[in-house]
Amino acid sequence: MKDRSSTPPLHVHVDENTPVHVHIKKLPKPSATSSQKSHKRGMKGDTVNVRRSVRVKTKVPWMPPGKSSARPVGCKWENPPHCLEITPPSSEKLVSVMRLSDLSTEDDDSGHCKMNRYDKKIDSLMNAVGCLKSEVKMQKGERQMAKRFLEERKEELEEVAHELAETEHENTVLRHNIERMKEEKDFTILQKKHLQQEKECLMSKLVEAEMDGAAAAKQVMALKDTIGKLKTEKQMTCTDINTLTRQKELLLQKLSTFGETNRTLRDLLREQHCKEDSERLMEQQGALLKRLAEADSEKARLLLLLRDKDKEVEELLQEIQCEKAQAKTASELSKSMESMRGHLQAQLRSKEAENSRLCMQIKNLERSGNQHKAEVEAIMEQLKELKQKGDRDKESLKKAIRAQKERAEKSEEYAEQLHVQLADKDLYVAEALSTLESWRSRYNQVVKDKGDLELEIIVLNDRVTDLVNQQQTLEEKMREDRDSLVERLHRQTAEYSAFKLENERLKASFAPMEDKLNQAHLEVQQLKASVKNYEGMIDNYKSQVMKTRLEADEVAAQLERCDKENKILKDEMNKEIEAARRQFQSQLADLQQLPDILKITEAKLAECQDQLQGYERKNIDLTAIISDLRSRETGGDQCPEYRVPTGDCQEGGGNPPVPAAARGENTGMWDPGKAVGERH
């Protein structure tokens, strides 16, 4: 505080509408003429401090405790007899004191209301996300329970499938046994007929042999009688010898015929047994070949079924992969929509904040324009007053004219700055329009994406319905197959029981034939060696058939597993599609509010453009006023001295200010360290 006088600081308490005019003595050092001082603005009642746009590094003057200072840039022209002080308005705030009545809180309230609405929307969205997460957790738990239940059902189905396979195996064995029994039955019927014929033939041969035996026995009896007679008579005549020789010849003849018939009978029996054995072997061979052909056809049919099932499994796997890819794309689209919504909300908030800031700046510019007009009016009034006092202050008027010229130059510079600011505002408005166009394009893109997503959802729903219908048809087919298998099983068990009873009856009827079969077993053993080879081949074919059946059972189990997995995947897809649909509906509900917000922002931008045009017109008016002032300043010595007011009001009511030349003292710049106008 070296440049100040030793006088203590002055505190002045005045009313709000009282004008204040302060004159300070000239500083002793000439270097102080180029220094810049700051005005102190009180912040009491309905007044607030306004931020300055230009800051100059100067020494801080003494301030009373508990107060803050604001440093506007001021210009001062000083000469030993006179001093003129001009404080140009800043580029952002053109008033030294701004009242609370000049500020409107409607935009702030609307901005706060919008922010509160967006916060509420965000809270509701977060709550919805939390609810969705809890639902997802519950669905996961339900899925785990369903998986456990399905695994239990799967085990039960595997057991049932194993039992069905065993029953099918038993059914096949029973079927083969029944076919064998039928074949044996047919064979026994034919054998009975053949045996009946052979029996008749044998009976005729046996009758012939008995007749030959009876004739031979008669001949032997006759021979015994003749021999007995000869023993009793002990004399043999020629007739006796002839009869004896004749009977001997007849006996030999009868014995030879009996031997021939016996031999032929044995040959017939042997041929009959050989025929029976060969026929039995041929029938067994035919049955084996028939079984082999049936096994080959069954194997081919199972291979075709396996190929068809493999194709169906591949198609189902491809469909599952396609559904997974579609679900993945749907989840990615939902994530991108979430990020786009957050980005749009952030942009809307930033644009609303920027719009509110622009509105405040525009209002401040309006206030500064009004203040400038008031200053110009005050200057004009002072010019009128100074014209009356021009005779006494000619010399000070010349200096004032110079200062006015410099001030006019400063005002021109300020007008140029305003032009630059207006150009910047135009650029900002153009940028805002471009951002609006980009928002419109984004909104159109979002609407287009919404339509695409709706189409995809419709396609997915159709696909899911088709898959559900296919699943229902497959389930119905499997149910029908199971019912038919159960019916066949019951029918075959009934047939098996009937065949068993018939077999027992046939066994009882075949008891007399077992003796003959025992005789044939000796000859059958010779053929067992050849039969073993066929049995080995049959075992190989049986093992192959068993392998094919096991493979078919495995394929059936795999198909059942695939069906179950398809059911699970379909359920999951339905749940994910419902969740994605809900998310898309919520997002669409949020996005439907964007056109209203965009319309509001467009209306605000249009108002800003209108206000900017009004400011341009005001700027033109101000330039016209400045040109008029210049033309008046060219009048030279005819214009009196005038001074710019330092505040909103001047001290002393309506009395005109006393010129410095009349008082006989030098004027200085208004120093808040020596005289302060405070409002409490």
Swiss-Prot record:
Self-associates. Associates with microtubules and forms a fibrillar structure partially linked to the microtubule network. Interacts via its C-terminus with PLK1. Interacts with ODF1. Interacts with MARK4; the interaction is required for localization of ODF2 to centrioles. Interacts with TSSK4. Interacts with AKNA. Interacts with QRICH2. Interacts with CFAP58. Interacts with BBOF1. Interacts with CCDC38. Interacts with CCDC42. Seems to be a major component of sperm tail outer dense fibers (ODF). ODFs are filamentous structures located on the outside of the axoneme in the midpiece and principal piece of the mammalian sperm tail and may help to maintain the passive elastic structures and elastic recoil of the sperm tail. May have a modulating influence on sperm motility. Functions as a general scaffold protein that is specifically localized at the distal/subdistal appendages of mother centrioles. Component of the centrosome matrix required for the localization of PLK1 and NIN to the centrosomes. The gene is ODF2. This is Outer dense fiber protein 2. One of its GO terms (biological process) is regulation of cilium assembly. The modification Phosphoserine is found at residues 68-69, 90, 101, 104, 110, 124, 134, 256, 627. It is found in: Cytoplasm, Cytoskeleton, Microtubule organizing center, Centrosome; Cell projection, Cilium; Cytoplasm, Cytoskeleton, Microtubule organizing center, Centrosome, Centriole; Cytoplasm, Cytoskeleton, Spindle pole. Residues 139-212, 275-418, 456-630 form a coiled coil. The keyword Phosphoprotein applies. Tyrosine phosphorylated. Phosphorylated on Ser-90 by TSSK4. InterPro entries: Odf2-rel (IPR026099). There is a cross-link at residue 133 (Glycyl lysine isopeptide (Lys-Gly) (interchain with G-Cter in SUMO2)). One of its GO terms (cellular component) is sperm principal piece. It comes from Pongo abelii. It comes from the Eukaryota. The keyword Coiled coil applies. The modification Phosphothreonine is found at residues 87, 105, 226. Keywords: Cell projection, Cilium, Coiled coil, Cytoplasm, Cytoskeleton, Developmental protein, Differentiation, Flagellum, Isopeptide bond, Microtubule, Phosphoprotein, Spermatogenesis, Ubl conjugation. Residues 27-46, 387-410, 632-680 are annotated as: Disordered. Belongs to the ODF2 family.
